[in-house]
Amino acid sequence: MILSNVKLIELPKISDKRGNLSFLEEFIHIPFKIKRSYWIYDVPGGEIRGGNAYKANEEFIISLSGSFDVLLDDGVNKQVFSLNRSYYGLYVPAGLWRQMVNFSTNSLALVTASTLYDKTDYIFEYEEFKSLFCKKQHGI
């Protein structure tokens, strides 16, 4: 998948004197049915999460608290997305190399996924990722 298919999506934000409320709905705010959710927290300083690509899984990543950067790579181009608001999320289609870095203290990342966990969907080696996706996406 090429980076132009990535989308930073603003979620609804309802505010009143009691605080704020945001939400997401499948096929309305994100373009897939949610099959799995997980969250990342207590990441030690300097650690990297991710470092993989998916053959089929799509994700929507939100910073519920704190901040972190999502580095995306389509095998030719790279782009960094900084997430630091709980009412913005990043849609990441399948076929992109993904890393999450620069976690602030007490950050909390929520990830919704389009597939159930399947280890065979993961690509952990960057060169394998490039050989699978670069030719298909960029004709390289």
Label the predicted regions.
Residues 1-88, 105-108, 112, 117-127, ...:
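Non-catalytic, conserved peripheral segments adjacent to functional cores
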Residues 85-90, 95-102:
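Well-ordered alpha/beta subsegment
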